[in-house]
From Swiss-Prot:
The lineage of its organism: Eukaryota, Viridiplantae, Streptophyta, Embryophyta, Tracheophyta. This is NAD(P)H-quinone oxidoreductase chain 4, chloroplastic. One of its GO terms (molecular function) is NADH dehydrogenase (ubiquinone) activity. Pfam families: Proton_antipo_M. It comes from Barbarea verna. It comes from the Eukaryota.
Length: 500
């Protein structure tokens, strides 16, 4: 056990420092904004310091572990710990939340509450990625919902209440399955119930029971990921949310579902995962094609980007269901890569909206002349989204391809078919992304409007765009930095499977 409670401090600090903000005298919005940014930067520095000096790359076991008795009556522990699977997502959370706090500068209405909810989300997300106890995992999973619901319903667009209600119905409904799974797994087959993930990883279950648990967890994670057909809350939510909230949703929230699939479905229930993986592979392949085909039909800019997120999540599902070393590594790399790319695209969509106050693509056009910096950044990040070589998305998708090719589980004909359908999806991706860019930035529509003038991106927006672009290019050029974090953990997860 670790001597110093690093993870507890990292989890508790944002929400406790954020709650202080609610009691401070109101000194204007600027104070709240800078206070939040300072907390986020401090938290990110603290996390980086703790991991740099205490995390050993070549150790697949749990590190920085903490184990405190919390509720005696229920035998409930506060168990924290990280491994190669969670370290990348925790650092991604810190980075994206800090930039989202900077992106939220234009928010003036109830800014204290807005920034507090952001920090509460921050704590919930890091708590989820570092929890080593199933009930604690569930509590952190639920802690996330309330801030997102309030951020949607109070600072969204015209249909914000509809999209917030849809979000809470989908996610809270799926949480029932998660709770049943958590209680079922912990109470099964022993006199003393245990919620400890390390002990549960060595537990074996009857096949029927394992399949039931797997389906319960799969439904919960499929809503968050999202996996079709449980994805319909996502375009509505992204279409109405403020763009700083969209950055958190696309950058981190969707990754929680994928993380849960690996952490619980793959690690705790290997036999059921082995049985379900061909179906997941089919769903992931359909998802890539479906989202890439549906996206061009969206008039709303943010909804179109949301469908691109659904398409990218298809690659993660395929990587997870390939049950191979490259496949799972590629899925983890795609989780990190899409976290940056999705957040960046939503930020630039929001920056454009701040200027022209239009959300529908058929009303836009001709913006490239007036805002060349935003146009340049949007074009580069669209290229990153369509997996241009040299960007992080390309490496992730390529490794997932290798994962399918090297998989021992599937017949050659089925592998060829899956790769063929994925290739069609990759051809459709540039079509909707480049047509989106063309509708926004080329043509004459806005130039012909009277009083047509607005300023290009300021230093804040330029700094934000470049900050997200650098890791995308960095991972694209040197992916081994991210891959080396999780490689030992991936091997230990796959050691439970008989092929791979």
């Amino acid at each position: 056990m670790n001597d110093f409670p690093w993870l507890t401090i990292i989890v508790v600090f944002p929400i406790s420092a954020g709650s202080l903000m609610l009691f401070l005298p109101h000194r204007g919005n600027k104070v709240n904004k800078w206070y939040t940014i300072c907390i986020c930067i401090l938290e990110l520095l603290l996390t980086t310091y703790a991991f740099c000096y205490n995390f050993k790359m070549d150790d697949p076991l749990i590190q920085l572990s903490e184990d405190y008795k919390w509720i005696n009556f229920l035998d409930f522990y506060w168990r924290m710990g990280i491994d190669g699977l969670s370290i990348g997502t925790i650092l991604l959370t810190g980075f994206i939340t800090t930039l989202a706090a900077l992106a939220a500068f234009p928010v003036t209405r109830d800014s204290r509450l807005f920034h507090f909810l952001m920090l509460a989300m921050y704590s919930g997300q890091i708590g989820l990625f570092s929890s080593r106890d199933l009930l604690l995992f569930f509590i952190m999973w639920e802690l996330e919902l309330i801030p997102v619901y309030l951020l949607l319903s109070m600072w969204g667009g015209k249909k914000r209440l509809y999209s917030a209600t849809k979000f809470i119905l989908y996610t809270a409904g799926s949480s029932i399955f998660l709770l049943i799974g958590v209680l079922g797994i912990s109470l099964y087959g022993s006199n003393e119930p245990t919620l400890n993930l390390e002990l549960l990883a060595n537990q074996s279950y009857p096949v029927t029971l394992e399949i039931l648990f797997y389906i319960g967890f799969l439904i919960a994670f499929a809503v968050k990921s999202p996996i079709i057909p449980l994805h319909t809350w996502l375009p509505d939510t992204h279409g109405e949310a403020h763009y700083s909230t969209c950055m958190l949703l696309a950058g981190i929230l969707l990754k929680m579902g994928a993380y849960g699939l690996v952490r619980i479905n793959m690690e705790l229930l290997p036999h059921a995962h082995s049985m379900f993986s061909p179906w997941l592979m089919v769903v992931g392949t359909i998802q890539i094609i479906y989202a890439a085909s549906t996206s061009p039909g969206q008039r709303n800019l943010k909804k179109r980007i949301a469908y691109s997120s659904v398409s990218h999540m298809g690659f993660i599902i395929i990587g997870i269901s390939s049950i191979t070393d490259p496949g799972l590594n590629g899925a983890i790399l795609q989780i990190i890569s899409h976290g940056f790319i999705g957040a960046a695209l939503f930020f630039l969509a929001g920056a454009s909206y701040d200027r022209i106050r239009l959300v529908y693509l058929d009303e836009m056009g001709g913006m490239a002349i007036s805002i060349p910096k935003i146009f340049t950044m949007f074009t580069i990040l669209s290229m990153a989204s369509l997996a241009l070589p040299g960007m992080s998305g390309f490496v992730a998708e390529l490794i997932v391809f290798f994962g399918i090719i090297t998989s021992q589980k599937y017949f050659l004909i089925s592998k060829i078919l899956i790769i063929f359908v994925m290739a069609i999806g990759m051809i459709l991706t540039p079509i909707y992304l480049l047509s989106m860019s063309r509708q926004m930035f080329y043509g004459y529509k806005l130039i012909n409007v009277k009083n047509f003038s607005f300023f290009d991106s300021g230093p804040r927006e330029l700094f934000l765009s470049i900050s997200i672009l650098l890791p995308i290019i960095g991972i694209g050029i040197y992916p081994d930095f991210v891959l080396s974090l999780a490689s030992d953990k991936v091997e230990s997860i796959l050691s439970n499977y008989f092929y791979g």
